[in-house]
């Protein structure tokens, strides 16, 4: 039997935890893609759309860090994991934080490589 997924209550989510989780460009990309994704998109689909060439265990590790930081909520559906960003909850707790981080990420991503 699979272990239950744990999610922090929104009151337990910290700015430091969010910044740590989003300090990795892969996780930042996952959050960005999840926000654009249709409802119910699972982790495997997100990984394919991001074109990430990484082992399933590495992908699971990224999702775990995002979940434990309180950025996403995940639910098991068979062998798949469906995740969504807690955007509304996070914006209520930390107004504008996630939007500001993602705006900066998109700006950096659009710059030509040096």
Predicted regions and their residues:
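N-terminal helix-turn-helix DNA-binding core of bacterial DNA-binding proteins
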Residues: 17-55, 77-92
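Conserved acidic functional residues
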Residues: 24, 62, 95
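N-proximal short alpha-helices
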Residues: 3-4, 32, 39, 63, ...
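Generic macromolecular interface patches on structured domains
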Residues: 40-41, 69, 100
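Short C-terminal domain-edge/linker segments immediately following a structured domain
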Residues: 61-64, 73-76, 103-106, 112-114
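Amphipathic alpha-helical dimerization/coiled-coil segments
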Residues: 2-14, 32-37, 82-114
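Canonical helix-turn-helix DNA-binding module
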Residues: 44-72
């Amino acid at each position: 039997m699979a272990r239950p997924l744990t999610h922090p209550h929104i009151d337990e989510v910290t700015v430091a935890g969010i910044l740590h989780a989003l300090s990795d460009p892969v996780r930042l990309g996952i959050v960005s893609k999840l926000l654009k994704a249709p409802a119910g998109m699972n982790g495997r689909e997100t990984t394919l759309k991001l074109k990430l060439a990484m082992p399933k265990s590495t992908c699971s590790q990224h999702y775990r860090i995002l979940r434990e930081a309180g950025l996403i909520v995940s639910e098991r559906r068979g062998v798949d994991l469906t995740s969504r960003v807690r955007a509304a909850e996070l914006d209520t707790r930390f107004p504008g934080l996630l939007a500001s981080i993602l705006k900066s990420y998109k700006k950096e991503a659009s710059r030509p490589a040096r």
